[in-house]
Amino acid sequence: GSSDNHKARAGSGYKEFARKSMGDSWGAKDNLTWILEPERGASFYSTGGLVAVHANKLDRDEIYDSLYEREVYATSGERILLWFNLTSESEIVPMGSETQISSNPSFEVMAIGSYKQLPGCPDYVSSSMKKDEITRLCLNECYNPSDERNLIDRIEIIKIQPTENLSKLEDAIQDPWKVFNCEDKGEGCSITFQDDDFMKEKISSVYYVRAIQEETLAVGGDPLRCEYNEQGECIKIKPCYASGPKFDPEDDCLAPIGERAWSSPIFLNYQN
């Protein structure tokens, strides 16, 4: 989740640029002898993810309370909004909760895409900070939202049940269990669903959700950059090098991906 990387630019996934300065993609220009080969991992790094919490207000105690209660979700870097609740006539149980249930569970999900970004920095930043300080902090590219949001493409539901049979994990981890395509018009996507098999199976289950945005360019989105044949097989690669003589400092290795947010689970214990 968190963009706690070694460049000290937390939350750097708001714009996709400068892969070596905004993320942990690093390595030497020249060939060196390493005990470990950092580019083997560095070629696959993104700009960093985010941890998001549902808090009543923006102060330390409220944020830490939400983290403790697990009412928290992660994103791949974009500031996507996500809610996931167990619903009933008497109460709403949020993501991160554990409860007992004696009927088929019903859920609701709402996701709203992140704001599309404008270049540069807002006027209030330039008027309150020195230019060299802005450059040092964010390379003159601040979080600078427009009035338009990225669209949510789909919502995926994952269902997990306990098992001791490791040879059939696909039966226990249904990923995805359900997929809901969205018709987002710029105001987000809301869905409801029910597990009609819960009382038949009589097995405690875990559920979590992923909200996936429409594709946008991302640093390291396709680090191998395969060339495919007509059968869809990768026949040639053009890796996104992070070091060595083939490293290109001007190449951010941008490729389209669906940025995403994924919730904390809801744990349901079957009650007879």
Question: Where are the regions a protein language model picked out?
Answer:
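C-terminal functional module detector
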Residues: G1-N272
